[in-house]
């Protein structure tokens, strides 16, 4: 009977990317995942936050590419929301305006417009503002230039009693940098990239369009990897693109993040010798070749 199980958990993120988690599991987990019995501890809640971050990053790379835009919207003092919920209402209204205006101006259907926005505040004394991603699928380059101007112009509010508008503040729409989104551009945004930067805000509420594609989790493979291969992946071959290409033919390494034991996955039941709690874990993002 096999004693050592290393789980390979693959998640397809749209047509172009795949995330893979590699970590040791117990024989009980290999047979079936048990029901959660206890409330999360503080440490586990912290891990759940990072897990949520990774899920959002996977969702972002499944839906947005270099033809989309990363948005940052700020408020002038006169329009600064009172709290995060009021900020969320402004973000929801902005999403509605973007979808309606895009359909009208470019003659596209709503399902072509993908939106993932956050109302955020960094720290208790920080100012409320907005970050997020927007993309309209199938646009020509000339249309994207016009779309970008429209995204910046729609950060506004109607002047009561008139048909005129005034800006809520500043809105910057920049082309999505996939290296920043993936977290492999070497900047201060860190290993979780743009989404990690957004999650660095103490208060945040996500507002999404309903048509976003969900990453697809594949059935786990618990017998493909050995402990020695896991150590190799987390050690000498962590950043070796050729080696990862041989492990996953047809895919190219984008990044590999090595975690301390139990940071990526924590076994709910430990085996007697407890070896799985001492094993390194890694999280890999790959892009499809061609």
What are these regions (language model features)?
Residues 1-128, 136-290:
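Right-hand nucleic-acid polymerase module
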């Amino acid at each position: 009977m096999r004693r050592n199980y290393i789980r390979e958990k693959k998640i397809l993120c749209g047509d172009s990317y795949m995330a893979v988690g590699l970590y040791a599991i117990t024989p009980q987990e290999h047979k079936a995942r048990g029901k959660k019995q206890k409330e999360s501890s503080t440490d586990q809640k912290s891990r759940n936050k990072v897990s949520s971050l990774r899920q959002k990053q996977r969702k972002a790379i499944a839906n947005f590419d270099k033809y989309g835009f990363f948005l940052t919207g700020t408020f002038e003092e006169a329009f600064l929301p009172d709290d995060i919920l009021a900020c969320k209402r402004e973000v929801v209204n902005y999403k509605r305006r973007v979808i309606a205006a895009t359909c009208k101006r470019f003659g596209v259907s709503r399902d072509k417009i993908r939106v993932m926005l956050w109302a955020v505040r960094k720290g208790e004394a920080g100012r409320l503002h907005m970050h997020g991603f927007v993309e309209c699928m199938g646009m020509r380059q000339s249309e994207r230039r016009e779309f970008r101007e429209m995204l910046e112009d729609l950060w506004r509010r109607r002047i009561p009693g008139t048909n005129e508008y005034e800006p809520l503040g500043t809105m910057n729409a920049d082309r999505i940098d996939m290296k920043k989104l993936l977290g492999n551009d070497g900047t201060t945004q860190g290993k979780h990239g743009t989404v990690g930067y957004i999650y660095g805000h103490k208060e945040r509420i996500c507002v999404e369009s309903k048509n976003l594609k969900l990453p697809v989790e594949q059935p786990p493979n618990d017998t493909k990897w050995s402990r020695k291969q896991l150590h190799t992946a987390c050690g000498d071959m962590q950043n070796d693109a050729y080696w990862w290409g041989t492990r996953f033919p047809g895919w190219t390494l984008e990044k590999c993040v090595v975690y301390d034991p139990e940071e990526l996955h924590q076994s709910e039941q430990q085996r007697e010798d407890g070896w799985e709690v001492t094993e390194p874990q890694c999280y890999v993002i790959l892009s499809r070749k061609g």
